[in-house]
Structures are given as C-alpha cells and as structure tokens.
C-alpha cells in the first residue's frame, strides 16, 4: 500500500445513527479508480448519495470507456451513464457543488482541458474547454494519476466551479502567473477568467483560501527570482458575480515577516486569515517561525485587527516548546485547517512531523545521498478564543509512520509543505455541523512498511466543549482504500482491487 494515497482519503462523520447494518455495492470491469472520481452528494450538511466516475476496461487501444454512477445514501444504484472518448482524452478529477457534478479531462492532442457537467440523473448538462498550452507541466496533468492526486477545482454552491492553475509566460523557467476561471452551472450565466497583469515579472503560485456569498479569496505567493527563498503573500479578493478584482493587498506587518496558511470566510463578506510569523528580515521559506498569527480582514482587503501567539510565551504554557518553534520530543506541526464554531472559538488542526536524525545519517552513509528519513505522528488541536488567545492544546495519539524524502534545504515550513504535496500526512478532513456547534476531524493511517495491509481510520469529534476520538482497524488485500462522507453515524469505505478490476463500496458504523 502506498503512503501517498492515504492523505487523499476524505470522510465526514456525524453523531446520530439511523441504520444498524452496513450496505454494500460492487462495481465491476474497472480499469482505473481514483479517489477524486468518487464523492458524496451533500445537502444541508447531510449525505444524500454518491457519484462514482471511473474508467472501464478497454475494448480497443484507440478508445477509452467511462461510466458515471449515481447511488443513494444507502448505496442503492439510482442511475448510470456510459460514454467513450478517444485515447487522447484522459479523466483527471471530479467535483460536486451541491447542484452539479463536474468532470475535468485533459486532451493531450489539443493540449486543452475539457469540463463536462452532469446532473444527479447522470445526464450531461454542459461542456466547456480551456487552453492548457501555457499551464506549468506540474499542473497540466494534475490529477491524472492513481497516486498523489491534487485538485484544481473548487466547488461553489449555487454558482459553479472555480478552476485555478499556474501558467508560464514563456518556457519552463520563465515567469509564472495565476489563472482563475469561473465556470457557471447554467449556460445562460456568464463565466469569467482572471489573470495576473501581463507586465508582472514575478514568479507566482496560488491557492484558493475560501469563498463566501460575495467574494473568492485567493492567496498569491510571489518571489522576484526563480530560486529565491524570499516569498511575499498577497490576498486577492474577486467578485464572484463579475470576476472583477475587488482588492489585491500585500499581507504585511510592521513587526514581523508573515506567511499565510489558511482563512475563514465569514457570511458578511469579511475574512480571518491565519499563518506563521517570523523575525522581520527572515526568509520565511527557510527560517524558524516565532508562532501563529490571526488577522481580521474587511471587505476591502484591509487588515483591521492583528493577534500573535508565540511558541516561547504562549504555546509553551501547554507544550514544551523551544524558541525556534520545535516542540521538545515532538518536532514540528503542519497546520491543515482553521475552523470557527458558533460561539466564535477558533480551532487549528495540526499534525506532527520530525526528522529521524540517526536514520537519516545512516541512510546517507549507505546510499551516499542527501535523503531525509521523516516520521509522521500525532494530531494536535489548538483552541483559541474569539480574540485569538490560546486557551488549550489537545493531543490525539496516532501511530507513527516513517518515510524517506529527498533532502530539503529549507526550514520546517518548507519541509511541511513538501510532505503535504507528497501526500505524506494522515489528516483527511475537518467538517463543521450545520449549526457550527460541533465539528469532526478525520484521519486515515496504516502501517507503511512494504507489504503491510493493516490500516485504520480514525476520528476526533468536538461537541459540548469536549473531544471524543475513535479508531477502527482493518486488514485488507485491496490495492487502495478511500473513505468518504456517510449518512449519520456512518462512513462510506471504497476499496479498489486492481487485479480483480472491481471497486467495493460499503457503509461502516462508527462507535459513537
């Protein structure tokens, strides 16, 4: 079993139970199955069904065959659609936005993306193409793999889908820029595309931070030279209806250098952004951080409040932390998500990682390489009040897993990002309840020793101011396993058996 798959597992768990027995469904003649080809159909934070899109066994070398299946919340088949395409058209990822299912394809002959939308009866609603000629090669085939999948689609409920990629102005080492496209649900609605100014000479990357009723919030990370470790963050706000830029402001601070990690979009149109802060002149990709920051941002993109929680002064009240942000006997934390509950408490969900120094030295001597031996361990939840003062840190035990990565010359932040993009972490999701009074954290872990088939999925539930956790262990001969949202009290497990060319879906009851 390959470690890159498990970080892409995603499941939602809810606390009430509505069925005492698990349901099952089997899909046969499956040539290729991807985690992003299956997803939950969710209404009002409740799973009402599933879509499953996969490649069927080929009938000839020039044609690919696909099938889209729609299932209800009990895995009962509702509808399906089979279709064929030329060999040059490859499925990359699928997404659901509360109304439609979008499937993204890459046409290698024309070097373009093709987006097709389907309703919940598996009937095609629309189609759109976008040029992929200038897309960075690391992005161009993103998702076209059974491993290490990542997403370029962001669903926007009631509106459409956001597609975001990095493009090159010239060759492979030329300046890069972000391109963001809104593809609306309706053919009558007008989509839009936003790109960086053609005059920009920066090297840019980007990521969608959040969406509310008014704006898309996008993080632009810029550097002036290709190999520079001096990054600058900009918060871009785009009007969802028009695609026009509302603001594009640098995330700056008079006291510190900062690096943005995450954001929370508030219903009124404003945002809260979170990240790490450093010494003022530090190069954020390499330096050790001083702690976490929380800033409030208004509807014009201006920072209105600033709060800092340092490792040495604040976090050390709950954990033994060194001044460089390294937790004693633990290492560092990679923060996956920040969430806000109905009572305005803020929770930061992190996962432990560290370098196994002795193992790395032994590996280097043995292989004459600069590889690093890393370990991924426990889950951490930081609890803040509504002013971003740290109130508690909870630690949840998780099995230790080891892996080897190429040598990283940057600091803990760069190493954490590298592990994230490799899919090395066990974290899967954080899901708020409809009233935002409760949330669940999901993770999937298993023994990464070669040949091992033992794995488990775990959950951390927060309700009434308290945490509860659960783990369920399994032994399986499947090639890969994925976990998805389930009806109340359940998760849906998908197991892909490559040799047998089949996918087995089943619902499993949780111990809550």
What does each of the following model-derived ranges do?
Residues 275, 292, 335-355, 369-383, ...:
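Loop/turn-rich, solvent-exposed surfaces of beta-rich toroidal or solenoidal domains
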Residues 42-158, 163-170:
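Post-signal peptide N-terminal segment of secreted/secretory-pathway proteins
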Residues 209-219, 227-351:
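Long, internal scaffold/assembly segments composed of regular secondary structure
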Residues 49-61, 161-174, 219-230, 276-291, ...:
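Short, conserved, GDST-rich strand-edge loop motifs in beta-rich repeat architectures
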Residues 65-73, 115-123, 175-187, 230-245, ...:
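Beta-propeller blade signature
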Residues 248-261, 307-332, 390-428, 462-490:
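Conserved blade-ending motifs and adjacent loop-strand segments that build the rim/top face
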Residues 33-47, 92-98, 106-108, 142-159, ...:
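Structural signature of eukaryotic scaffold interfaces centered on beta-propeller domains
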Residues 1-27, 512:
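Bacterial Sec-dependent N-terminal signal peptides
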